């Protein structure tokens, strides 16, 4: 079984979000645990450190026709932890300050999609399946069909439907160079007067997955379908969810007791050292999607509950300013770390008591699973992957490894948080919840097995 995993990013080479984590951990697990010959292909961004590419081997180069001109494409190969990574080299498109968000992203990533299809002769790797991820690789199924390559199956995984790769429709002829009459239609790339790259993956791939079972159902609704819920209803027969996992090796556990880790964290971040005060944390991109408006609305009430609060994240300035001001108002009780620090994030997971994640929607989410590994109990809104990975605690049965609320509003969030704090002040109960959280298997083993089964099913037809 040969699989080519096409992605816009992969840790440790380049990462802007959860896709980078998945593109590292899933192929590694499929290779090591399921014996799948899987290789990863991504752009060779100038942001990738020379140290990571020092052993890169140049496999070859050629010119491909893109946007009405010939364009150089080179392929370089690096092996990491048993997985081969191919890098699509072109300085015109990928020697940029940003991974995404450039003025010509349309041309950059249609080039990438074409290059994936056109360089199999260079890699000498003919896959049974190309596994595409998000809009950056969503045109690959189209270019395979345009080239008449029908013996390579395609899977398209949606990591976040909100990002669809919208562009003006004139690029169909000007850049994509495909038949407008054939592809600019509702059951094609058309999205109102624009085109959506992501729709290419949805319509033309052989199978669609999302990153959790619940999210696969949610994108069929008007509320969370981002304008194409009808398309997912139509293609329901080839759609399913497979919840992500976490790479446990990336999150090593400390041998120190929690109370020491908590005290160390409090000292490091300038909080009063208070062993019995519930320490509530959020580690997130500061974006409305993450439910931050609920926290802003109820922040004064939260602080009245006798808690400490840590924020680690960066994003919208209005949130950055709000949380920075709260640190000023609540010296010794609030720390707002605007930015991101991997080492600090691990210390926060290990030293905190409650992880707050009230997302408006969440395709999967990794933070809640990382928190549970460290015994930091998640309080989440029951949506998408949060619903699938956190079982709300039931004090009558003793079952559950976190706390959840169903409706997307601030009142339900604060009500659930109060209940979690109430349980926190019952030490025996709280230790039972921690025990439940730590024993939950959030590894990549089960998801990798499900993907292998899906690959096998598609190959067998």
UniProtKB/Swiss-Prot annotation:
GO MF: alpha-1,4-glucan glucosyltransferase (ADP-glucose donor) activity; alpha-1,4-glucan glucosyltransferase (UDP-glucose donor) activity
InterPro entries: Glyco_trans_1, GS/SS, Starch_synth_cat_dom
Pfam families linked to this entry: Glyco_transf_5 (PF08323), Glycos_transf_1 (PF00534)
Transmembrane stretches, start-end: none
Keywords, in A-Z order: Glycogen biosynthesis, Glycosyltransferase, Transferase
Uppermost EC category: transferase
The keyword Transferase is annotated on this UniProt entry: yes
Matching CDD domains: GT5_Glycogen_synthase_DULL1-like
Reactions that this protein is recorded to catalyse: [(1->4)-alpha-D-glucosyl](n) + ADP-alpha-D-glucose = [(1->4)-alpha-D-glucosyl](n+1) + ADP + H(+)
Residues that, per the record, bind ADP-alpha-D-glucose: 15
EC number, UniProt record: 2.4.1.21
GO biological process: glycogen biosynthetic process
Keyword Magnesium assigned: no
Pathway linked to the protein: Glycan biosynthesis; glycogen biosynthesis
Role this protein plays: Synthesizes alpha-1,4-glucan chains using ADP-glucose.
Family, similarity comment: Belongs to the glycosyltransferase 1 family. Bacterial/plant glycogen synthase subfamily.
Identification of the protein by name: Glycogen synthase
Organism: Fusobacterium nucleatum subsp. nucleatum (strain ATCC 25586 / DSM 15643 / BCRC 10681 / CIP 101130 / JCM 8532 / KCTC 2640 / LMG 13131 / VPI 4355)
Gene encoding the protein: glgA
